[in-house]
């Protein structure tokens, strides 16, 4: 599998059942990097052992007047000067797109302090983790996990007009989250349907696989991938990535892109995914379901009352904001 190829290259344990991973690069952002840095410095950090990106895209400036937390950014900038990091100033980039465009090569592994860390469309197996694992990586320590199961996501067909990547992602999440079919496993996107998708479309699906409860995701690479690297000035980062002729998977999810329809996710999790047409046709049923679920979710907080049915006007859903 693609997953095996990438993990084997990064494993230092000598045992593919129990992995000790070293990453190619890492990324952190402004509402997590202070604690990560302080932990790493208190534990002996001198220089970052790999390229380490610091972005400022997660709204710590929004608290009061847009300036109250500028000291956070100064702290990170000084850490980059001190220890050799890459500081991306506020308002310049969102972390995941920066990593895709500037850092990730085919076959790489990255660790980033955000749950939606997914750079699989470039042939990378990347991990979103909490602060302690990022601090460990800053200190040159291994990321230790057992070898994960791998699920093939076999794509056929092509999306219809008005169907976007979120519709495909919600269809997948709705099918596999509640039954734990892909939990803590790696999703490997293969099949003839991949070539019908632009890189941005693939990225939109890829970043949402987190909500399926999988560990990571990776895609075969092709000419669209090669062009993506060329457009962003890094043609040398591209590598043809595909499974071997006898790749063995622990399971398979088949998605016929021809049949995917516009979807909507209702509270309180993206796996509550339904065809948008069904919700529009019977809003009483679906919004009533959400209200009943809210009673269970907020049973210990009697002050919270979810009123969605009042948004139904003449049989149609009134949207307050978007």
Give the residues covered by each predicted segment:
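Fe-S-dependent hydro-lyases/dehydratases of central metabolism
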Residues: 1-322
């Amino acid at each position: 599998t693609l997953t095996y190829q990438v993990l084997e290259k990064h494993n230092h344990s000598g045992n593919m059942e129990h992995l000790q991973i070293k990453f190619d690069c890492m990324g952190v952002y402004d509402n997590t990097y202070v604690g990560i840095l302080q932990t790493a410095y208190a534990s002996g950090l001198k220089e970052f052992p790999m390229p380490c990106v610091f972005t400022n895209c997660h709204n710590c400036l929004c608290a009061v007047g847009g300036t109250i937390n500028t000291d956070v950014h100064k702290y990170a900038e000084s850490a980059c000067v001190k220890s050799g990091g890459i500081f991306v100033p506020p308002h310049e980039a969102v972390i995941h797109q920066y990593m895709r465009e500037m850092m990730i090569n085919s076959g790489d592994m990255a660790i980033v302090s955000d749950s939606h860390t997914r750079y699989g469309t470039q042939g990378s197996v990347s991990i979103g983790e909490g602060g302690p694992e990022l601090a460990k990586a800053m200190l040159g320590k291994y990321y230790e996990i057992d070898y994960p199961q791998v699920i093939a996501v076999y794509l056929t067909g092509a999306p219809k007009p008005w169907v976007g990547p979120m519709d495909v992602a919600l269809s997948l999440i709705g099918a596999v989250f509640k039954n734990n079919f892909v939990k803590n496993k790696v999703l490997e996107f293969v099949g003839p349907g991949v070539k019908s998708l632009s890189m941005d479309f693939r990225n939109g699906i890829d970043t949402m696989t987190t909500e399926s409860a999988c560990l990571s995701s990776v895609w075969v690479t092709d000419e669209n991938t090669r062009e993506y690297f060329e457009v962003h000035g890094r043609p040398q980062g591209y590598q043809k990535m595909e499974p071997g002729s006898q790749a063995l998977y622990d399971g398979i999810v088949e998605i016929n892109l021809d049949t995917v329809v516009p979807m909507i996710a209702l509270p309180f999790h993206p796996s509550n995914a339904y065809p948008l047409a069904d919700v529009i046709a019977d809003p009483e049923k679906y919004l009533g379901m959400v209200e009943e679920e809210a009673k269970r979710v907020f049973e210990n907080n009697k002050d919270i009352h979810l009123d969605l049915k009042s948004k139904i006007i003449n049989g149609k859903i009134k949207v307050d904001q978007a």
